Each structure stands twice: as C-alpha cells, then as structure tokens.
Regions:
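C2 and C2-like phospholipid-binding beta-sandwich domains
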Residues: 1-18, 45, 51, 58-60, ...
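Intrinsically disordered, low-complexity terminal tails and linkers
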Residues: 11-28, 38
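Short, low-complexity cationic-aromatic patches
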Residues: 30-32, 52-57
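Short structural boundary motif marking the start of a folded domain
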Residues: 33-38, 59
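A structural motif detector for short, solvent-exposed N-terminal "entry" segments of globular domains
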Residues: 36-53
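Short amphipathic beta-strand segments in non-cytosolic proteins
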Residues: 62-69
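Short glycine/proline/serine/threonine-rich loop/turn segments at secondary-structure transition edges
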Residues: 95-100
Length: 158
C-alpha cells in the first residue's frame, strides 16, 4: 500500500445563468441576482482496495447540492480515476448567499450487492457562497481529502 490520502480534485468556474435577454449588471461591488457555478469533478487518486483480495475499486462520485444529486460515471477496476464531468449548480440570488452545504460522496460500485461508500467530504455553505460571488469567468481548482467515519481514507494503489 502507498498509504497516501485519498483525494478528489474539484474545479469551479463562475458564470451567469443563460437567459433569453441580456441582464443589466450592477456595479462590481454589488453582487446580486442569479449565478451559475460549473463544478467539475475532475479526478480521484489513492483509492482504497474495496472488492475483496483481487478486486480494486469501481469508483463513482455523487455531488449533492440544494436537494439535487449529480452522479459521475463509474470507472472500473482502478485506484485512481479521471472523470472531468461538469455539473451546473444554480442559485437564484447570490446576494442572499447559499444556505446549503455541498456534499461529495465517493462510492464503490458492486455488481452483485449494494454499492459501498468509500467516504465523503463537505464544502461548507459559506464557502459555496464565496464561490458563487466570485467574479464571473473566474475559475480555480481545489483538492479535498476523502473522510470516512472521521478519518482520512488511505489509498492502496498497488
């Protein structure tokens, strides 16, 4: 085992919600109105061994925000995966902030039984509000450690 922490890379790009008519933008300091955050679940590295002695991991990610779930495709038999799948998260008025956390859960797909939870991490509502309020067109990426039962998930990789 390599014993490195299992980590997920997320990318975010701030944008406007497409509309039939262009909106009149207020002054730069007054951020309000609807916004879209394009959240990309980029990749995961250092997954743990999940499927018995010989099996690796069949990971997929579920991103949950304001009651809506977004799911990546399942990657088979691996200790790392690249998804680069983008989901559009919308908010009606950024001036009010965001009250919901964003939860990302990693799962191990199983053909014959219930899928197993690998672990998860949360992006706090306050941080989501900051992201939604960032300048339109701005983007960045962040790496998150996957947590299970209060501890960092450690990868197998070999």
């Amino acid at each position: 085992h390599d014993k490195k922490k299992c980590e997920v890379v997320l990318k975010a790009t701030v944008g406007e919600i497409p509309r039939a008519f262009p909106s009149v933008t207020a002054s730069h300091s007054d951020v309000s109105g609807p916004r879209r955050l394009d959240f990309t679940v980029a990749s995961v590295a250092h997954l743990p061994k999940m499927d018995g002695i010989f099996g690796k991991c069949d990971p997929y990610a579920v991103l949950e925000f304001e009651g809506i779930e977004y799911r990546t495709e399942t990657k088979k038999n691996t200790y790392e995966a690249v998804w680069d799948e983008t989901f559009a998260l919308d908010t009606e008025d950024v001036s009010k902030g965001v009250s919901a956390n964003c939860l990302v859960t990693l799962w191990d797909w199983d053909a014959a039984s219930k899928d197993d939870e690998i672990g998860c991490f949360t992006i706090a509502a306050a941080r989501m509000s900051e992201l939604f309020r960032a300048d339109i067109g701005s983007s960045g990426s962040e790496t998150f450690s996957v947590i299970d039962k209060g501890k960092a998930v450690v990868g197998h990789d070999k």
